[in-house]
Amino acid sequence: MNTVRVTFLLVFVLAVSLGQADKDENRMEMQEKTEQGKSYLDFAENLLLQKLEELEAKLLEEDSEESRNSRQKRCIGEGVPCDENDPRCCSGLVCLKPTLHGIWYKSYYCYRK
């Protein structure tokens, strides 16, 4: 019975002493991994930031193209039917209801101001 106790005590002492050494090693390993993890996070953050900047540049480029193409390309000349809600009469013309001619075709025409 004494040999069992001595053996158990010896195994217990070895486990405690080796466990503490492992604890210190584990602490150092965890610290190294944490530092590596921070560098990985910084790398991933920079990569994500670059992708977002590229997307933003593309979106701004598309907006500038739209603004260049957004001007009115064609306009309606004098005496041509127009839409009251969306008048596309040329500059110097106004979309008005006709007085005599054309009252039976459409309700609005482009006239000089």
UniProtKB/Swiss-Prot annotation:
Cellular component terms per the entry's GO annotation: extracellular region
Tissues in which the UniProt entry reports expression: Expressed by the venom gland.
Chief location: secreted
Residues excised as propeptide: 22-74
Family (UniProt): Belongs to the neurotoxin 14 (magi-1) family. 01 (HNTX-16) subfamily.
Signal peptide: 1-21
Keywords carried by this UniProt record: Disulfide bond, Ion channel impairing toxin, Knottin, Secreted, Signal, Toxin
Disulfide-bond pairs as recorded: C75-C90, C82-C95, C89-C110
Location in the cell: Secreted
Residue span of region Disordered: 61-83
Function field: Probable ion channel inhibitor.
Pfam families found in the cross-reference section: Toxin_22
Domain of life of the source: Eukaryota
Organism of provenance: Cyriopagopus hainanus
InterPro entries according to UniProt: Toxin_22
Name of the featured protein: U11-theraphotoxin-Hhn1f
GO molecular function, one term: sodium channel inhibitor activity
Domain commentary: The presence of a 'disulfide through disulfide knot' structurally defines this protein as a knottin.
UniProt keyword Calcium, yes or no: no
